[in-house]
Amino acid sequence: MAAYFLLGLYGSTLVYRLIFHPLNRFPGPLAARISDLWLCTQLGGHDMHHLSERLSKRYGEFVRIGSSTLMLTHPKAVAAIYGPGSPCRKGTFYDLEQPNRGIATRDESLHAGRRRVWSRGFGDKALRTYEPRVAAYVHMLLGRLADARGKPVDMARLAEAFAFDTMGDLGLGADFGMLRQARTHEAVEQLVQGMTIMGRRLPMWLMRLLIDVAQALVPTAATTGFLGFCHHHLDRFMADPRRSERPSLMAPLLSHYEKQNIADRDLSILRNDCRFIIIAGSDTVAATLTFAFFYLAKHPGHVTRLREELFPLRAADGTFSHQRIFDAPHLNAVINETLRLHPPASTIPRVTPPQGLVVADTFIPGDMTVFSSQYALGRSEAIYSKASDFIPERWCSRPDLIKDGSAYAPFSIGHHSCLGRPLALMEMRLVLAETLSRFDIAFAPGFDANHFLQHVHDCMSWHIGKLGLTFTAIE
């Protein structure tokens, strides 16, 4: 009897998904119509970015990549799915850490409340107090480059060290010591390993199952590894009587927590937000700086142009203030172009409202998972001329190379956009300005640029291999 029941269950599911499903009119691989597991079978190389580009070129701007999942690469999809007036809501992806909650939650009221508290740490006044501390880590990075004396360095690891050290300080007043000790912290290595499974884009029910099994097998996981690392530093921050003397991203979150009635306090929210600060604040900066240095080494003419733009903006001591460079056209163009080609969060899923959603005169049924691939959009000839080429001028002197600027949203848009954008841009501008004013950069001997790009992995954040560069001090 059980066999007949299962045969009927799976048989009817198969017929429904192949013939009667509301998404059947959208093109896509046949196996993807049958099961969401199709997607993870295609991502053994953790290359969702490449797959999304291939699928959009083969099937068009609306591609069914799961039984109830649609990938969109139409430029109007960004505003429709993520914009301020979008009726779309967060999907099951945001249940991954249940029952723990934080700013990355499906609960819109909780998210709105947490976002208001978070925003206090990212205002203009706060950024001005952070700048000297960011500058200190920039100069520590410059010291590491100078110590190499023109010998090859792995810029991907140095950018990672800079980003995590800076976020440890600004987020929690903590010293992670990665730049000082010239090594990757073991907790960061564990984070990278833990994020690798995200690159397979497993269905959420399977991800939850694996997490529950892992927690059952390793019950100490919450006190060891990256989670334990974050909790340890949060506990130290909470116990520090002098924490109010140095502004930090965590301070307004903790202040809000302590003002609540004891019965209303939820330490898990604070812990989740702590982890989110460290991860989100570090990955974007580290990856974007790595790719920016890659393209500048590949296209040295832009280094010359940047120096011509930046040298007149230096202070008497040869350093830069963010106020002087924040609107430097070519510097911002280099950053924007890097983010176009390698967006930090390429696939952010949403669920259409029950009444459905219209994108560019195309109706998408209700309660379907949709996302817009920033990676595929960034390389679409329908949106950018010479889309595969690194041309920063499209963001300043050559706006004709952008056919539809509304598709560009590396930090997302709307009320779920990245609050840390101003801080991330400040870090990137200062690193690039200070480094390029002191060093000539080039690929290390034997470095293969194509191999480097082919072995970049998309694990919801970028996992980047060794970027061998030489930095030679300018005479």
From Swiss-Prot:
Enzyme class, spelled out: oxidoreductase
Location in or out of the cell: Membrane
Gene3D superfamilies tied to this protein: Cytochrome P450
Designated name of the protein: Cytochrome P450 monooxygenase sthD
Transmembrane segment boundaries: 276-296
Protein EC: 1.-.-.-
Keyword Signal: yes
Cofactor requirements of the protein: heme
Catalytic reactions on record: betaenone A + NADPH + O2 + H(+) = stemphyloxin II + NADP(+) + H2O; betaenone C + NADPH + O2 + H(+) = stemphyloxin I + NADP(+) + H2O
Underlying gene: sthD
